[in-house]
């Protein structure tokens, strides 16, 4: 039974452009335009920069001699501070010191994660045009609001200057990393931050993919399946990849863009806030200076507990004459964060399921991000993989910048034999599909499909004499397009008038190596075609929306199935009725073969059925099935009698016997 496009219906496609990172794509071409291309890991809590030089990657130390730089920006009455200088003065200047801005970038102000963060940071997050902005006093007491992109740009500028000091020349081009589960709005905002920092962001690369390069660059030989577990200061990613002689193919990705070391710090802080209240009857939760001191000590304690079983948290003159001196054991730390640690296993399972691999098929578990030093996290991962030890061969703080620098070397043409065979194949995290009659999202390309990709399918019209078909492009996991996201639309006009179901319209979806989507529709009879290019649009899905789509798809799978069955039942009835109506009015079919009362009976039955359909737009599947049986009970005996009189075989279910093709096409 053919499905169809309604008058306003669409061919829809869901495509994600996240991280279409192909090292081979126009590398030589770009190299002629680019100078040295640095690799920057723009992290929630720390950032890192590297460059590919003289056949290997150099991770560049900052002016303090450190290879990682705090992603902090501070404002005083006289200057702006970035990195260690900003973090070191945060306790005495909390309201004017900004950190964790990666948790705001590309998000909407009303996002629940943003609202949660507003309560946890000492600086002011305000609403400007629906986006979260940071309001601080800068020099001379002037109040200013900054977008998250502007603050990120300040950190990128610091990394750029660090590289320039080392290389002794100006740098204009960079590869910047983002979490694999960042959505397009977050990616676009990151690119914008690069522009503000005076950088051409030559490529956005996914953090786990970059880390996989760091792990696999020198690995020769046969195919290996690796799982990259990337738990940083503010975000969490899991990617499953296959590495085979320089080809890095991402099989699946999953994650949480709001889970990391900062959350573990907050749990320790909450514990001590309650302890101080109980012991000293003092509430420090509203005092930003006290919280700043506590935050710094809690982070230090957390780090120490990765190698020690107990630490002492000591802060003199914390608040109102109270000195804090309390022990914190590793066991207590693990208990405080137990649910968060266990939460990381969900995306691991989903990524494994999507990759279609068994636990025993993973050859290496690669740990990335400072939070993977936590023994409990390593133990949970080891238990999940039934005793397999995670690989600790890459530096968890530097691996992402290392991979980004390799990609930069390829793009600049400075890569040598070590990089010449590297090929990165990343994936689209959401399903692509087309809409057919009733708003059904017909899924074409599943999430985690390797891109670039191309898919064509033939559709037909829903109405008689339909000359225009509306093509709309969607993304999402649900069964109906109303629950998916529209990316763009266009019309194919000039389709020659014909009965419904006759025209053949070929729709082609193609995503190139740069993540740009092209959709083309062509009428095969006339050769008339139209196409649309959808670049990464701003205001795309927030991570919350992506998570909601997948979660709802799981929760409402049964409900979606029922709705789809109902639409299919309605379409079956409608198609049968229109077929009968056309046959009794077409002289080449049944019109001249029917006796007067037979024709009247069929016309009355089809007329009554169409009126019933108009009045029963939202009936249940069973009602449509019952109505179809009623119409068939009237029409089928008459059709059988006609064919017996003419010596032919009856058309099954009243289908046209002149139909040449068995293959049915979805209708547009």
UniProtKB/Swiss-Prot annotation:
Subcellular location: Endoplasmic reticulum lumen; Nucleus
Gene: BIP2
Sample GO molecular function, one term: ATP binding
Gene3D superfamilies per record: 1.20.1270.10, 3.30.420.40, Actin, Chain A, domain 4, Substrate Binding Domain Of DNAk, Chain A, domain 1
Source organism phylogeny: Eukaryota, Viridiplantae, Streptophyta, Embryophyta, Tracheophyta
Keyword Transmembrane helix attached: no
Motif window: Prevents secretion from ER: 665-668
Annotated protein name in UniProt: Heat shock 70 kDa protein BIP2
Cellular component terms (Gene Ontology): endoplasmic reticulum; endoplasmic reticulum lumen; mediator complex; nucleolus; nucleus; plant-type cell wall; plant-type vacuole; plasmodesma
Region Disordered, residue ranges: 643-668
Induction pattern: Induced by heat shock and sugar. Up-regulated by light, DTT and tunicamycin treatment.
Its job: In cooperation with other chaperones, Hsp70s are key components that facilitate folding of de novo synthesized proteins, assist translocation of precursor proteins into organelles, and are responsible for degradation of damaged protein under stress conditions. Involved in polar nuclei fusion during female gametophyte development and is essential for the regulation of endosperm nuclei proliferation. Involved in sperm nuclear fusion with central cell polar nuclei at fertilization, which is critical for normal endosperm nuclear proliferation.
Family of this protein: Belongs to the heat shock protein 70 (TC 1.A.33) family. DnaK subfamily.
Assigned keywords, A-Z: ATP-binding, Chaperone, Endoplasmic reticulum, Nucleotide-binding, Nucleus, Signal, Transcription, Transcription regulation
Any one biological process term the GO annotation gives: response to endoplasmic reticulum stress
Acidic residues bias (residue ranges): 657-668
Extent of the signal sequence: 1-23
InterPro entries: ATPase_NBD (IPR043129), BIP_NBD (IPR042050), Heat_shock_70_CS (IPR018181), HSP70_C_sf (IPR029048), HSP70_peptide-bd_sf (IPR029047), Hsp_70_fam (IPR013126)
Chief location category: endoplasmic reticulum
């Amino acid at each position: 039974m053919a499905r169809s496009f309604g008058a306003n219906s669409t061919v829809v496609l869901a495509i994600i452009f996240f991280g279409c990172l192909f090292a081979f794509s126009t590398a030589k071409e770009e190299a002629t335009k680019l100078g040295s291309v640095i690799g920057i890991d723009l992290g929630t809590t720390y950032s890192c920069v590297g460059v590919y030089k003289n056949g290997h990657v150099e991770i560049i130390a900052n002016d303090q001699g450190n290879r990682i730089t705090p992603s902090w920006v501070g404002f005083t009455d006289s200057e702006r501070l970035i990195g260690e200088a900003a973090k070191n003065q945060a306790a005495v200047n909390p309201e004017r010191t900004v950190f964790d801005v990666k948790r705001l970038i590309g998000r909407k102000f009303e996002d629940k994660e943003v609202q949660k963060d507003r309560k946890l940071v000492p600086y002011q997050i305000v609403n400007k045009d629906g986006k979260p902005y940071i309001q601080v006093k800068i020099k001379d007491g002037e109040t200013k609001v900054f977008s998250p992109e502007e603050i990120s740009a300040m950190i990128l500028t610091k990394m750029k200057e660090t590289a320039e000091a080392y290389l002794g020349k100006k740098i204009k081009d960079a590869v910047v990393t983002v979490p694999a589960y960042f959505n397009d709005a977050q990616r676009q905002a990151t690119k914008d931050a690069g522009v503000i920092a005076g950088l051409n962001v030559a490529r956005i690369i996914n953090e786990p993919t970059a880390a996989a390069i760091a792990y696999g660059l020198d690995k020769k030989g046969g195919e290996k399946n690796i799982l990259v577990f990337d738990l940083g200061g503010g975000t969490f990613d899991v990617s499953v990849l296959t590495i085979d002689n320089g080809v890095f193919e991402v099989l699946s990705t999953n994650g949480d863009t709001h889970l990391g070391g900062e959350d573990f710090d907050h749990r320790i802080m909450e514990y001590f806030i309650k302890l101080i209240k109980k012991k000293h009857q003092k509430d420090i939760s509203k005092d930003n200076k006290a919280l700043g001191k506590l935050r710094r000590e809690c982070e230090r304690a957390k780090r120490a507990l990765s190698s020690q079983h107990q630490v002492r948290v000591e802060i003199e003159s914390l608040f109102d004459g109270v000195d804090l001196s309390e022990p914190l054991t590793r066991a207590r730390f693990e208990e405080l964060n137990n649910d968060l640690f266990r939460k990381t296993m969900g995306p691991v399972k989903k990524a494994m399921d999507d990759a279609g691999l068994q636990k025993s098929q993973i050859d290496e578990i690669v740990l990335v991000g400072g939070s993977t030093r936590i023994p409990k996290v390593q133990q949970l991962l080891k238990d999940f993989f039934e005793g397999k030890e995670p690989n600790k061969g890459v530096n968890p703080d530097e691996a992402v910048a290392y991979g980004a620098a390799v990609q930069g070397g390829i793009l600049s043409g400075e890569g040598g034999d070590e990089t010449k065979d590297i090929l990165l194949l990343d994936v689209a995290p959401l399903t692509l599909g087309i809409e057919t009659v009733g708003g059904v999202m017909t899924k074409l390309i599943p999430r985690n499909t390797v891109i670039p990709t191309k898919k064509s399918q033939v559709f037909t019209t829903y109405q008689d004499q339909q000359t225009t078909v509306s093509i709309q492009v969607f993304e999402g996991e649900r069964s109906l397009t109303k629950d998916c996201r529209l990316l763009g639309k266009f019309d194919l006009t000039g389709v020659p008038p014909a009965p419904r179901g006759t025209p053949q319209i070929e729709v082609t979806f193609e995503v190139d190596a740069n993540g740009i989507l092209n959709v083309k529709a062509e009428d095969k009879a006339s050769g008339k075609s139209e196409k649309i290019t959808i670049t990464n649009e701003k205001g795309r899905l927030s991570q919350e929306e992506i998570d909601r789509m997948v979660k709802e798809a799981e929760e409402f799978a049964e409900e979606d199935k029922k709705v789809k069955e109902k639409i299919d039942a309605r379409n079956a009835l409608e198609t049968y009725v229109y077929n009968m109506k056309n046959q009794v009015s077409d002289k080449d079919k049944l019109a001249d073969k029917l006796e007067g009362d037979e024709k009247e009976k069929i016309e009355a039955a089809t007329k009554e059925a169409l009126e019933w359909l108009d009045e029963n737009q939202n009936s249940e599947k069973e009602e449509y099935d019952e109505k179809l049986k009623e119409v068939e009970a009237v029409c089928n005996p008459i059709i059988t009698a006609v064919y017996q009189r003419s010596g032919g075989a009856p058309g099954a279910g009243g289908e046209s016997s002149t139909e040449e093709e068995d293959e049915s096409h979805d209708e547009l």
